[in-house]
């Protein structure tokens, strides 16, 4: 018997069986193959038959000759892989520094240092064939997890990662939104007369890419979510 295709596949595989009736030891002519009974019970007349499967395993075919004798052929199929691989990824400091690593998905991630992608994948069948990532509206790009993408330019970007296995199955896409902002915020001020002889300090700030998170006043109090303060 033969199995087609004979390489890893994520689709069905066809078992092709051919049978012969050997010459008896007593010298008489063999009676010839009458039929082949398929694993699902279907009887096919003649000495050849095909059977399609979608799951790995052992499949039994019963060969019957015209004399009523039978033999069982055990056909092995082990190259079907219909399971999707899995992938996870996160970002780590490019310099290997001791910083908090974000592993959860779903929230925008803020970084003020160069980062490198850390991706890992798993597959229960044919094995991982390739890793791919996409930044923003860009094209899918193949990468080596041993030499992963690095991000050193300031940007706000949506990163998506997926993997393929040898059989052609693709994983669920995993995504992260990152803000890479390495520029410290700047501030400027003006002075204007206030009440009771006091002076107002009018503070304006620029938070570059990610904006200003907070302003700490001289007395230690903190104002959140503003970029100007009097």
State what each model feature region is.
Residues 1-230:
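Low-complexity, disordered linker/stalk regions enriched in Pro/Thr/Ser/Gly
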